[in-house]
């Protein structure tokens, strides 16, 4: 009997060591892109009831809207759970995940991703659209709906999808364990002062709508239904950029769906001059603003948020985590 228990405890100890080793190696080799992955990793570090405004979508919101400006100007506690080329189904599952940990007073979705076509994005987008979530039923569903069959097992296991990073490992990869917390306010940084000059087409004459891709509309409606179910106000918008006629027709369709659900939709391609934006000075490429444009756009949104929604000024709350971090 003693031999049995000795073998049993040795086996348990061995398996426990294997699990710990697997965890440590997984953390070191895990993908660590800022968008879609590390922003979610830091989201999990936030105390409950930290986030009043949840920002979702592609780089059109991730690069163009700076949460630190929202905080500094209006005391808006906003968090950006964006991902590059974030697909509508990824947005849906990221929203579901976020609502497990925070109860925002407003959800803001940049709907550029709703104009996408195709069922599967690039592999990089697959990684950034799935690997930021903690392992759960929702993460499994997200991977199954996002990835073609040949990529699913690697994405589900995590480590096989990222093991090739061995030649990219830096000291920062050893600061990604559960005891490493990052609760600071998000901010956008554009290095240098890049400028891309272009003109946004006059879309006033584009009045017809075009159907969204079937899969995109299904998950767009799932997002809207979830917000209705949770009784959380939602604002749909699209930041101004160098768009094409087909995209505007799809934005018209998005406007129709938004009206169906009773949610406002701000298409800033129609009135970007009201934001004070100059497309010959305030952009670093055809879709993303430089720091001058980011400040103008985010400042406009800050004023809009507080004038249309009941959002507290968290700078007055000494117990809020971002007051403690700032201090």
Please tell me what each predicted stretch does:
Residues 124-230, 315-327:
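Secreted/periplasmic serine-hydrolase-like ester/acetyl group-modifying domain
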Residues 56, 60-146:
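Membrane-embedded segments
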Residues 106-118, 177-274:
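Conserved, well-ordered alpha-helix/loop/beta-strand core segments that scaffold catalytic motifs
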Residues 252-325:
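C-terminal regions of proteins
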């Amino acid at each position: 009997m003693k031999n049995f228990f000795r073998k049993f405890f040795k086996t348990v100890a061995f398996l426990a060591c294997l699990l710990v080793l697997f965890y440590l190696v997984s953390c070191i080799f895990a993908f660590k892109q800022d968008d879609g992955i590390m922003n979610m990793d830091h989201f999990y570090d936030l105390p409950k009831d930290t986030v009043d405004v949840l920002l979702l979508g592609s780089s059109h919101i991730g690069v163009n809207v700076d949460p630190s400006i929202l905080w500094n100007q209006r005391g808006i506690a906003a968090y950006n759970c964006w991902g590059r080329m974030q697909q509508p189904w990824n947005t849906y599952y990221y929203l579901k995940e976020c609502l497990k940990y925070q109860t925002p007073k407003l959800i803001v979705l940049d709907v550029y991703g709703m104009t996408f076509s195709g069922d599967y994005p690039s592999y990089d987008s697959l990684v950034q659209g799935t690997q930021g979530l903690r392992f759960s039923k929702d993460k499994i569903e997200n991977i199954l709906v996002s990835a073609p069959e040949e990529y699913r097992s690697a994405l589900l296991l995590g480590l096989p999808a990222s093991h090739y990073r061995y030649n990219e490992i830096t000291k920062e990869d050893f600061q990604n364990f559960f005891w490493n917390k990052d609760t600071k306010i998000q901010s956008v940084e554009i290095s240098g002062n890049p400028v891309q000059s272009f003109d946004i087409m006059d879309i006033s004459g584009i009045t017809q709508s075009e159907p969204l891709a079937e899969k995109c509309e299904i998950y767009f409606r799932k997002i809207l239904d979830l917000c209705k179910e949770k009784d959380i106000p939602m604002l749909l918008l699209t930041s101004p950029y160098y768009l094409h006629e087909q995209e505007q027709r799809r934005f018209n369709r998005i406007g129709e769906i938004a009206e169906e659900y009773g949610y406002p939709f701000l298409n800033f391609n129609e009135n970007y001059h009201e934001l004070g934006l100059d497309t010959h000075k305030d952009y670093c490429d055809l879709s993303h603003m430089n720091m001058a444009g980011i400040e103008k756009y985010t400042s406009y949104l800050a004023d809009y948020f507080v004038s249309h929604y009941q959002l507290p000024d968290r700078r007055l709350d000494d117990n809020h985590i971002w007051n403690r971090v700032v201090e």
